[in-house]
């Protein structure tokens, strides 16, 4: 699956591209020089763009400009999957190599590395088209890193949360299954088996209380969901028109609250009472030591109705200044600090899922 490329654009698009401020004067000189044309720095950019756009152009011109003007994707949320200990490391490595070969054959660039700490890293560089942008800015340069980390229970596969990475993840798991003699069960973090809206909310409130040594400071954003109940009417039953309820077709599925002390707000608790549950949350936490920085985290179920595709991201940290004050600008965490934090978040999420599942089972037994 090659992620589309541009092969031709209009003269107007070329004119606009050469007038774009992202294109430096030196790059303008280079593109003219590639045609054997020398230009003066005194010539106006608009005149140069008008002249060049009238020339005959080829793919290399479009590729040169789209590489400069194309956008780069933002950091994406991560999602993880557990691979059991019955799978051998050499089978995982072989599956990763086979996936790399397949991706490269599709026209993208993929490479597998065994890191010093034992992690298996699969890096994919590819391009996507965003047709909402102007022609020479439609190319989005993307990079997806699939990490397979050895764990006490086997391996943890961590991938970005997007459609392309999900396809590669499924391909990798399929190849691991093919390399293994026995049936392999891959486990993801999910609340699909729990329908109680209170327990779904409890998953998040318990999750964020403490991640490793990081204790909850405040929730800044809470997103809640209320699935629409499917109602079916049996036409064989006679109904009294006077007693029939009127459905006005009004149903609010999603709501969000932002600010300070969101979890304690009356507005959120009133939504709980109506059957809403949390599906996405952004919060800040810190270690108890004096002078610790504030960490901002986000966790969500990408499919809020079924509570599947659990994903998360360490958004960064606010550096401690002095006397209880913190910087206003958020700073990106180092690779090692982020990895350690995400591992702790994953472990806490799985632990919380087990506790919530046990609680749901006990409540079910009481009802029986």
Predicted feature residues:
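Intrinsically disordered, low-complexity, charge-rich terminal extensions
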Residues: 1-154, 159-368
């Amino acid at each position: 699956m090659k992620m589309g490329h541009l092969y031709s654009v209009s003269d107007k698009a070329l004119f606009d591209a050469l007038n774009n401020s992202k294109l430096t004067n030196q790059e303008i000189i280079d593109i003219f020089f590639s045609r054997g044309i020398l230009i003066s720095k005194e010539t106006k950019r608009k005149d140069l763009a008008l002249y060049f756009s009238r020339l005959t152009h080829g793919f290399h011109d479009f590729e040169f400009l789209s590489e400069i003007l194309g956008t780069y994707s933002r950091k994406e949320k991560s999602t993880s999957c557990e691979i059991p200990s019955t799978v051998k490391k050499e089978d995982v490595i072989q599956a990763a190599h086979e996936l790399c070969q397949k991706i490269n054959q599709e026209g993208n660039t993929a490479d597998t590395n065994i890191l010093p700490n034992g992690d298996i890293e699969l890096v994919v560089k590819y391009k996507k088209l965003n047709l909402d942008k102007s022609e020479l800015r439609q190319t989005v340069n993307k990079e997806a890193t699939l990490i397979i980390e050895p764990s006490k229970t086997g391996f943890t596969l961590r991938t970005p949360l997007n459609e392309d990475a999900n396809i590669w993840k499924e391909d990798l798991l399929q190849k691991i299954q093919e390399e293994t003699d026995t049936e392999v069960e891959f486990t993801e973090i999910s609340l699909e088996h729990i329908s109680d809206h209170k327990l779904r909310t409890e998953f998040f409130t318990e999750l964020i209380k403490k991640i490793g040594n990081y204790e909850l400071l405040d929730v800044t954003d809470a997103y809640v969901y209320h699935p629409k109940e499917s109602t079916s009417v049996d036409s064989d039953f006679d109904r009294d028109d006077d007693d029939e309820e009127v459905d006005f077709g009004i149903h609010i599925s999603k709501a969000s609250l932002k600010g300070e002390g969101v979890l304690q707000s009356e507005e959120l608790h009133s939504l709980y009472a109506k059957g809403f549950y949390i599906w996405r949350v952004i919060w800040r936490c810190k270690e108890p030591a004096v002078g610790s920085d504030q960490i901002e985290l986000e966790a969500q179920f990408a499919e809020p109705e079924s509570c599947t595709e659990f994903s998360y991201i360490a958004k960064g940290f606010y550096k401690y200044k002095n006397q209880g004050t913190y910087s206003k600008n958020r700073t990106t965490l180092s690779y090692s600090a982020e990895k350690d934090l995400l591992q702790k978040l994953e472990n806490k999420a799985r632990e919380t899922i087990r506790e919530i599942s046990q609680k749901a089972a006990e409540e079910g037994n009481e009802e029986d």
